[in-house]
Each structure stands twice: as structure tokens, then as C-alpha cells.
């Protein structure tokens, strides 16, 4: 649905509410730029839309190898194609990091030689395509995605680097940050505020909670990923279930790689991320129930 809405925006134009966002609220400044129009579907902005589409690519792409049924596989392939299209028209360069990060995580968690070889081959081909060739440069969306692999040539990236250096000087005296909700926006009017806009979710956490809060945040999520990975590798015996849950966890891992480059921890992106953790923790119980059902079926057949 999100990709279809993006297609409608691209070919039929924006409706009144979307035009209000663009031309009254100032969204045009970041969505109608020199490289083209960044479409945002029914999401809050193009970055949110692009990363959500990237989540669909990785989740359905990895799950495709573990599902049964021809029609279900066809449906998953159609979803992946739609998600690739949606990610492309969003013009969100950070989104490309998500499927790459998810694929890298899958290589680690798969414990399968064929999967490892396939994953490494796909990563190598992606790297060669975007870094070592100019294929598709006549397409504005491919050209924009390719620029993510050449950050030194990107003026906006260099501006972000300079801003982070200035932020670091201010944050030395703010070990607990400026306060929750004060990293961005005009919702609050505090006495003191970060003069430079945070360019990613992790930078927002750093500005709001300081180095202490950022370390705590990363530690908690590091434990979650390690714990869930351990469950998938050693606690779940059903290969199909393990593969499907691995798709969820790898998508979450790729999301945090994208969150380093862009502020994408927004609704509804946060829902699949913490759903992934919940499903992994529930995995052993689901695995046990599936095993019991299988044993019951075998007894009934006898």
C-alpha cells in the first residue's frame, strides 16, 4: 500500500494535505530538491518512507527462502519489488544501509555454508555495482543511491561531519544531555538548546541524554541483539522457524545501521524493531509448541 501511494504521488501528484506539508509547513525544502522530488507516500517524510520500504526488502527477502507454497513465494517477490521501487523513489540514501546490514547479519546468524556464500556474493556484487561502476547513472534514483557510497564527494555529508564536531565541543559539558525531547523541533522552549540539528537517531539520543544515556542505550540494545542471536543459534531447532525469526532480527540490525545515518526511529518503524525482539524471545516457546504438534500428528498417523 505504501509503495502504491508513492506511485500515485509520482504519477498523479500530491493531494491538498500533502501540498500543505510541502508548501506551508516547509517540507518542500527537503523533499523538492535539485536532484529531484523525494516522495513520502503516507509517511511523515521521505526518510521514514524509504527506510520502511528497506525493512520490507530485507524482511521479505530473507523470509522468501524459508516459506512454503508457490503462491506465497510469488506474493513475497511482488512485495520485494514494490519495496525496492518505494525505496528508490523516496530518495533516501541511508535506506540502502538497511538491507546491506541485514544481509551481513544474516551471514553471521545463518550457520549455513550455502547461505554464507550467497550472502557474501550478493554483498560483493552490490559493492561492485555501486562503487566500481557507473551503470544506471542516467536514472536519478540509482545515481542518488550510488552517492551514499562516495560520502567524501557529498557536500551534505561533509556538513553533517562538521556539525557533529561542533556538537562534540558542546556536549563535553553535558554528560546527561539537553533533556528528553529537546534535540529537535519547536515543541518546547527550554532555556538552553542544541544550536545544530541532529542528523540521525543516535545523534538525537546523544544530544538528549548525553554520553551516559547514549552508552546505556547502546548497551541495552547490544545485549538485546546478542541475547536474541544466541536464542536463534542455539535454542531453536526448527530450521524454518529459525530462518523466519532471523529475518526479523536481521532487519532490526540493519535498521540501526540506517539509524546511524538518519533520524528514522519514527512511527511506524519502531513497531517492527521491537516486535523482532519479542518474537525472538518467544521463539523457544513457539518451537516447543511446533514440536509437540508434530509429535501429536505422528501419533495420530500411527
Specify the residue positions occupied by each region the protein language model found.
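A membrane-periplasm/extracellular boundary helix in multi-pass inner-membrane enzymes
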Residues: 4, 10-13, 87-90, 107-151, ...
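Transmembrane alpha-helices of multi-pass inner-membrane enzymes
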Residues: 247-302
